[in-house]
């Protein structure tokens, strides 16, 4: 894979997450009935960063959960020997029933990950509302899904790939476009 361009550096990403945090607070008139749920793996770290910023804005904490969608995907990642899905587990510290759940992921592409996440959430409770926050929306939807909060829209071709690097997993913050 050949890197074509860095489309978000660390400063641009910080600004995008700060803007998303303000939008979440504004749209929900605070965060009293809200829960951030990050989709494993990078969505969790983005959700934690949003929670930190929302805490600074509102002066109160917002609950953060982790969602593993492995069993809900239609393109399961399988272990090579016994052909069973790799499951890491979800951890949502609060009952999501009647809560506004803000799903958080790094990249929105076909919509299949988000559909799987909604299926997983519904098995855990009955939220009053599900919203979606993503760092990058690259288009190419296969399902009728759109993000409520977007850090940056990055139109891509189907021959390109978006790579999100985060400090927590990759020792740097940036978003790049690569040729496949």
UniProtKB/Swiss-Prot annotation:
Record keywords, A-Z: Glycosyltransferase, RNA-binding, Transcription, Transcription regulation, Transcription termination, Transferase
> Where is the short sequence motif PRPP-binding located?
101-113
Q: Which CDD domains match?
A: PRTases_typeI
The record, for InterPro entries, names:
PRibTrfase_dom, PRTase-like, PyrR, PyrR_bifunctional
Q: Which reaction does it catalyse?
A: UMP + diphosphate = 5-phospho-alpha-D-ribose 1-diphosphate + uracil
A GO biological process of this protein is: DNA-templated transcription termination
Question: What GO molecular function annotations does the UniProt record carry, in alphabetical order?
Answer: RNA binding; uracil phosphoribosyltransferase activity
Where are the bilayer-spanning segments? none
What does the record give as EC number?
Answer: 2.4.2.9
Oligomeric and partner information: Homodimer and homohexamer; in equilibrium.
State the family it belongs to.
Belongs to the purine/pyrimidine phosphoribosyltransferase family. PyrR subfamily.
Role: Regulates transcriptional attenuation of the pyrimidine nucleotide (pyr) operon by binding in a uridine-dependent manner to specific sites on pyr mRNA. This disrupts an antiterminator hairpin in the RNA and favors formation of a downstream transcription terminator, leading to a reduced expression of downstream genes.
Per its record, how is this protein called by name?
A: Bifunctional protein PyrR
Species whose genome carries this gene: Bacillus cereus (strain ATCC 10987 / NRS 248)
Q: Which gene encodes it?
A: pyrR
């Amino acid at each position: 894979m050949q890197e074509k361009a860095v489309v978000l550096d660390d400063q641009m990403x910080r600004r995008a997450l700060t803007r998303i945090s303000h939008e979440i607070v504004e749209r929900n008139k605070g965060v009293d009935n809200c829960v951030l749920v990050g989709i494993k793996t990078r969505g969790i770290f983005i959700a934690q960063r949003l929670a930190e910023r929302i805490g600074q804005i509102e002066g109160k904490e917002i609950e953060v959960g982790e969602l593993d969608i492995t069993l809900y995907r239609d393109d399961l990642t399988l272990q090579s020997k016994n052909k069973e899905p790799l499951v890491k587990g979800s951890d949502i510290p609060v009952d999501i029933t009647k809560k506004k759940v803000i799903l958080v992921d790094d990249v929105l592409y076909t919509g299949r990950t988000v559909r799987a996440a909604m299926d997983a959430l519904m098995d855990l409770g009955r939220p009053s509302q599900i919203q979606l926050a993503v760092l990058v929306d690259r288009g190419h939807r296969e399902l009728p899904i759109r993000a409520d909060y977007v850090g940056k829209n990055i139109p891509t071709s189907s021959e390109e790939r978006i790579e999100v690097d985060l400090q927590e997993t990759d020792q740097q913050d940036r978003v790049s476009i690569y040729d496949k």
